[in-house]
């Protein structure tokens, strides 16, 4: 495995971080046994100006996390399943990246397959117990690493975000084109290469 992504990696706009997380290695030791997978799909969410952002829903725990320290896990429940986000934003802003799907590496198969954000969390044993974990620190239950074995020059595609009723007019869902471990979500506008 390559080097651990530094804290500074997450101190950038969420869309930049989401795109650059593709191909990186997510390690979850949340259940005690460590599992590794390659990030294949991610969505960017901004602050209160983003109609799909949780930052618009009051000033509770999630709002504080979105404005909080970049590089920390943000785990919350939706539709009876856990979702894993990584806080990412420029200084003084808010934002996070929702990890939607990943390709299992070790073990080579996970049940359920980690395709879609709820299934990713379930397959990697992610729940509120890892909320706030620093993904840039060794020994954390969740970490993100460089991937020296990533396919050189894989194509990144992008589209609108999945399952949002009101969206920004930007393609904020990024994924590895042609990878079988990407959700088959219907979104508009149509996917394009980014």
From Swiss-Prot:
A Pfam family assignment: Pur_DNA_glyco
E.C. number(s) listed in UniProt: 3.2.2.-
Organism from which the protein derives: Aeropyrum pernix (strain ATCC 700893 / DSM 11879 / JCM 9820 / NBRC 100138 / K1)
Keywords, comma-separated and alphabetical: DNA damage, DNA repair, Hydrolase
Membrane-crossing segments per the record: none
GO biological process: base-excision repair
Tagged with keyword DNA repair: yes
Similarity remark: Belongs to the DNA glycosylase MPG family.
Gene3D superfamilies (alphabetical): Methylpurine-DNA glycosylase (MPG)
CDD domains for the chain: AAG (cd00540)
Entry keyword Protein biosynthesis: no
InterPro entries listed in its UniProt record: Formyl_transferase-like_C_sf (IPR011034), MPG (IPR003180), MPG_sf (IPR036995)
Example of a GO MF term: alkylbase DNA N-glycosylase activity
Protein name: Putative 3-methyladenine DNA glycosylase
